Amino acid sequence: MAPGASAPAASRSEDEVGQKIDRCFADSLLKVTGGVAIGIVASVAFFKSRSWPIWFGSGVGLGTGWSNCRHDFASPYVLHGKRVPAGQDSQGKPAYNIITEQHKQ
């Protein structure tokens, strides 16, 4: 290792939980926003500007965001990163490595 360079810090469980919470909020916000947008379009185009499609779309978005969050927290070993081809295994099937993103502090 070069002088002055520090070793990469080990990932703490608090940091991993924080990243999962951040990803959960971002995903839920995106899904709720998409549901509201689809609800607005459906309300204007098909339902004579009634408000229930907007509420229905936001509920569907919130429900899918909640479901994704539960799945993310229930499977602690899921790695979020890029899948990079690494050749083939002994049976001739493609093998992949998962490269996770390192957050700089």
Swiss-Prot record:
Membrane topology, from the record: Single-pass membrane protein
* Xref: Pfam families: DUF543
User: May I have one GO cellular component term?
Assistant: mitochondrion
User: Where found in the cell?
Assistant: Mitochondrion inner membrane
Annotated region described as Disordered, given as residue ranges? 85-105
Q: Which key words tag this protein in UniProt?
A: Membrane, Mitochondrion, Mitochondrion inner membrane, Transmembrane, Transmembrane helix
Instruction: Just give the chief location class.
Output: mitochondrion
TM segment ranges: 29-46
Source taxon at top rank: Eukaryota
Q: Which family does it belong to?
A: Belongs to the MICOS complex subunit Mic10 family.
Q: Which PANTHER family match?
A: MICOS COMPLEX SUBUNIT MIC10 (PTHR21304:SF0)
Give the multimer and partner information.
Component of the mitochondrial contact site and cristae organizing system (MICOS) complex.
Role:
Component of the MICOS complex, a large protein complex of the mitochondrial inner membrane that plays crucial roles in the maintenance of crista junctions, inner membrane architecture, and formation of contact sites to the outer membrane.
In Swiss-Prot or TrEMBL terms, this protein is called MICOS complex subunit Mic10
Native species: Caenorhabditis elegans
What does UniProt list as this organism's lineage?
A: Eukaryota, Metazoa, Ecdysozoa, Nematoda, Chromadorea
